[in-house]
Amino acid sequence: MTVDSNTSSGRGNDPEQIDLIELLLQLWRGKMTIIVAVIIAILLAVGYLMIAKEKWTSTAIITQPDAAQVATYTNALNVLYGGNAPKISEVQANFISRFSSAFSALSEVLDNQKEREKLTIEQSVKGQALPLSVSYVSTTAEGAQRRLAEYIQQVDEEVAKELEVDLKDNITLQTKTLQESLETQEVVAQEQKDLRIKQIEEALRYADEAKITQPQIQQTQDVTQDTMFLLGSDALKSMIQNEATRPLVFSPAYYQTKQTLLDIKNLKVTADTVHVYRYVMKPTLPVRRDSPKTAITLVLAVLLGGMIGAGIVLGRNALRSYKPKAL
């Protein structure tokens, strides 16, 4: 018991031992210093809140365009390629993919300019390609909403113009292909006509040599190239005249090609009739700013001011009570 009592007495007299009650008393005595430090910290925080740039984020959710928005474009593709035209679902997926790529490119441009702007695009639901969430950060709520809507419209118009150019290029190429097809079919039809006339002329020569002027056969449907001269020279001469003035004969494919070519020439697709996205949620008007956070800033100011004030009080008291050890 004696040893424990002495030990306790020794600990109580140790000058290096921290006495919690004494510590609290020191802080209480220096409360004015702490209060002043807290007030200064709050004033600095208020000053920061007044000069700091506010950040407001507007968000929109978009997805692929619906069938009506791509109807003009898909109809044009159907005219161009018929049964080989892409499905409407493929067109919709292509449109939103091009929008996403163009929007990402614009985001990079804005981020790399002298006065950076934060424009983002990402999956709205993780793991799902659609819908997409796009957002823009500005110094005002109205500005964020307005600029986001403007950038979405800007990308939509740019992609629509690109699609219009692509479609016009395809129209030019397909028109050239169809015209070449028509020319080829016309050449073939003319060659067939010339061949027919030569065959009749050859039969006429044989008929003249054989001195056959009148038909020697009754069933003309049985006439072949070898027996055509039996029709007689008079009939063969009439046939040559008829063949020379007879229009070219074409297959149904020729007239279908001409109809397709006419339909293509009548196509009218402009950028303002094409939209490459559809809103699921239009750009929001933010009601809470991202930063600076007033409540958090003031709470941190109070805590920091209190800690600095307490440090000043304790440091000052420690210097006053400091006694250098004797050598």
UniProtKB/Swiss-Prot annotation:
Q: Does the keyword Transmembrane helix apply?
A: yes
- Record topology, Cytoplasmic segments: 1-31, 316-327
Q: Which terms under GO biological process does the entry name?
A: lipopolysaccharide biosynthetic process
What stretches pass through the bilayer?
32-52, 295-315
Query: Entry's InterPro entries?
Result: Bact_polysacc_biosynth/exp, LPS_length_determ_N_term
User: Pathway it belongs to?
Assistant: Bacterial outer membrane biogenesis; lipopolysaccharide biosynthesis
Q: Which Pfam families match?
A: Wzz
Task: Tell me which UniProt keywords the record has, alphabetically.
Answer: Cell inner membrane, Cell membrane, Lipopolysaccharide biosynthesis, Membrane, Transmembrane, Transmembrane helix
Q: Describe its membrane topology.
A: Multi-pass membrane protein
Location of this chain's protein in the cell: Cell inner membrane
The similarity comment for this entry is: Belongs to the WzzB/Cld/Rol family.
Instruction: State the function annotated in the UniProt record.
Output: Confers a modal distribution of chain length on the O-antigen component of lipopolysaccharide (LPS). Gives rise to a reduced number of short chain molecules and increases in numbers of longer molecules, with a modal value of 20.
Q: What is this protein called?
A: Chain length determinant protein
Task: Name the gene.
Answer: wzzB
